[in-house]
Amino acid sequence: MVGLPTHTLSVLVEDTPGVLARVAALFSRRGFNIESLAVGATECKTMSRMTIVVSAEETPLEQVTKQLHKLINVIKVVEQEADNSLSRELALIKVRAEAGTRSQVIEAVHLFRARVIDVSLESLTVEATGDCSKIEALLRVLEPFGVREIVQSGVVSLSRGPRGIGTVR
């Protein structure tokens, strides 16, 4: 939704079947669109971490957060504040790069500290990591060359410093 503040939630869950479906269903029932979702292993083999990005007003988000805490298999929910956390995503971008423009594309890629991971006669595939604004800026620079295909991971986020989401109830 345009104009609503964006929130990043870290949700620590038990690594069991159906947890993702229950969490996603809760957001869906409340009318939230999940803008980004990444799920992966944690330092504890029995738990997974979900990073969920949504645009919402504070009060409705607080209600959803309280309901998340009530779900079986949800251990902890933390909102990652931008100034106290690090967030990154990965993008793979296939861009047209024929002989006449290839060096320009490679130069643009290097300016963003991205890297070329595949080369063909007519295209390059680029791997870029960074915050959302960096990925968006790279896409704007590559667009005039002809972006053929894009895939982006969801955002992943960790708190800065020694504090973390923890692994106990």
From Swiss-Prot:
GO terms for cellular component: cytosol. Its EC number is 2.2.1.6. Pathway: Amino-acid biosynthesis; L-isoleucine biosynthesis; L-isoleucine from 2-oxobutanoate: step 1/4; Amino-acid biosynthesis; L-valine biosynthesis; L-valine from pyruvate: step 1/4. The keyword Amino-acid biosynthesis applies. InterPro entries: Acetalactate_synth_ssu, Acetolactate_synth/TF_NikR_C, Acetolactate_synth_ssu_C, ACT-like_dom_sf, ACT_dom, AHAS_ACT, AHAS_small-like_ACT. It holds the Pfam family ALS_ss_C. The keyword Amino-acid biosynthesis applies. Keywords: Amino-acid biosynthesis, Branched-chain amino acid biosynthesis, Transferase. One of its GO terms (molecular function) is acetolactate synthase activity. Residues 8-85 form the ACT domain. It catalyses: 2 pyruvate + H(+) = (2S)-2-acetolactate + CO2. GO terms for biological process: isoleucine biosynthetic process; L-valine biosynthetic process. Belongs to the acetolactate synthase small subunit family. Dimer of large and small chains. This is Acetolactate synthase small subunit. It comes from Mycobacterium leprae (strain TN).
